[in-house]
């Protein structure tokens, strides 16, 4: 069986919790690999997924005026069900990795946020997180099936995820007292992406601390 390509980076300790990172529409761009390396330095086995490996163009795309429209077009044509199935394959791969202690979380960034939310409802994970996740509102029917803690972080200035969508996410996850949905004042889309003009180091640090604390405390899936 073919499996999605992943970028794997491991911490110094022998066994650790794993994070499956689901990137933005541009793919495994340098900023995402930088984040993956940082999570490994903080004690997590990290697997960053190329969600576009089935598409005609699998490569990393740029954020410039030429490449961005192509990235948006590619993202608009994906098969959502195939991607979420692929995420499940990577979750199983992470759990079976010799460096994993049996605990696996999913972290979605931008485009990846939708699949982090779906993973919380469909896959065997201990927790899910997201930084300025998009299109989660398309999957609200998954909300009542969310079966793990959440730590999802949005920017108050981010027009890609308006207040009514965030309110709906809160509503459909209200059955879980451990569903943390946070809106950060003064933060815009891409607040967590190093090197982006909207990168907000203070907000990014707060959001990252919350997510990694959740992932550190998560139990193994049973």
Region spans (language model):
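N-terminal cap/leader regions of alpha/beta-hydrolase-fold enzymes
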Residues: 1-222
């Amino acid at each position: 069986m073919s499996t999605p390509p992943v970028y794997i980076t491991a911490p110094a300790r022998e066994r650790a919790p794993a994070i499956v990172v689901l990137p933005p529409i541009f793919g495994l761009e340098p900023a995402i690999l930088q984040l993956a390396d940082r999570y490994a330095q903080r004690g997590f086995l990290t697997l960053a997924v190329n969600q576009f490996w089935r598409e005609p163009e699998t490569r990393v795309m740029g954020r410039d005026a030429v490449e961005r429209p192509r990235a948006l077009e590619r993202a608009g044509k994906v098969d959502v069900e195939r991607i979420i199935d692929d995420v499940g394959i990577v979750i199983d791969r992470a759990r079976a990795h010799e460096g994993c202690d049996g605990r696996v979380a999913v972290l979605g960034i931008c485009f990846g946020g939708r699949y982090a939310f779906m993973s919380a409802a469909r896959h065997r994970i201990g927790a899910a997180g997201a930084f300025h996740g998009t299109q989660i509102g398309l999957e609200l029917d998954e909300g009542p099936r969310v079966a793990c803690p959440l730590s999802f972080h949005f920017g108050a200035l981010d027009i890609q995820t308006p207040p009514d969508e965030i309110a709906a996410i809160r509503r459909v996850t209200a059955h879980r007292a451990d569903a943390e949905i946070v809106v950060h004042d003064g933060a815009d889309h891409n607040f967590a992406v190093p090197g982006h003009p909207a990168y907000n180091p203070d907000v990014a640090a707060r959001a990252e601390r919350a997510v990694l604390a959740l992932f550190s405390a998560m139990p193994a899936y049973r």
